[in-house]
Amino acid sequence: MNFFSILGELLAQSGFAALTWRNCVMFLISFILLYMAIKKQYEPLLLLPIAFGMFLANLPLAGLMNEADHWYQSGVLRIMYMGVKSSLFPCLIFMAVGAMTDFGPLIANPVSLLLGAAAQFGIYVAFTLANATGLFTPGECAAIGIIGGADGPTAIYIANNLAPDLVAPIAVAAYSYMALIPLIQPPIMKLLTTKKERQIVMKQLRKVSKVEKVVFPVFVVLFCSLLLPSVAPLLGMLMLGNLFRESGVTGRLSDTAQNALCNICLLYT
């Protein structure tokens, strides 16, 4: 066996031989996202891990994401992805978000709850557009619609339940949309408001007592879970994190949820 035949065999077994245009397209998308994360600093904590994970997952013959194999033999990225597919990481992220959230302004001014209704507009627009294409089932359209709410963990959770085959693209689309909000939001704000309106200083809200802040997460979970049981996993973890924060007796758990746990989950999702 001469040198050239050995070289030919080596190349035939290398990733170059298995490289397709689809891999190249995904490489290009991942490089664009990396550029946006590093150069433009659009939500780098979200975009950079997503972009590089996308790059690694599309390396041909690398064995990092073999969906055909059993989960413990399917590559390190597939094993990490099981945490996303099982909704473990989205729920843990919600716990971290809850630990970082102060619901005091909402308790003091419940009318501000209506501001959250704006997210429903984006959800219905995305759902309608997906349904209009005729390419997706109603469940898949609903999962795609959640992207319009700009909420990555919720989009992943809903996709796991309604469109398991679309979890990966929906997750990437949702987090990319979240990362682009700093670019999308300013021109819309300037279009819909005047300069004088943007200079309005909000009045100081009433002081919210500790009892109210402790009772709030318990009441919300009880009421919403009885009204709509399917929201219990996400909402329960969100309010558990908030209870860590507001109880005043679990400082270490609150700090861990806000920092270490949140960062670990961001790495894996």
Show which residues each predicted segment covers.
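N-terminal alpha-helical transmembrane segments of multi-pass membrane transport
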Residues: 1-72
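Alpha-helical membrane segments and immediately flanking helix-loop junctions
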Residues: 82-87, 94-100, 115-125, 138-165, ...
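Interfacial helix-loop-helix linkers and transmembrane-helix boundary segments
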Residues: 38-47, 66, 79-80, 100-115, ...
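Membrane-embedded hairpin module used as a gating/binding unit in multi-pass transport
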Residues: 176-250
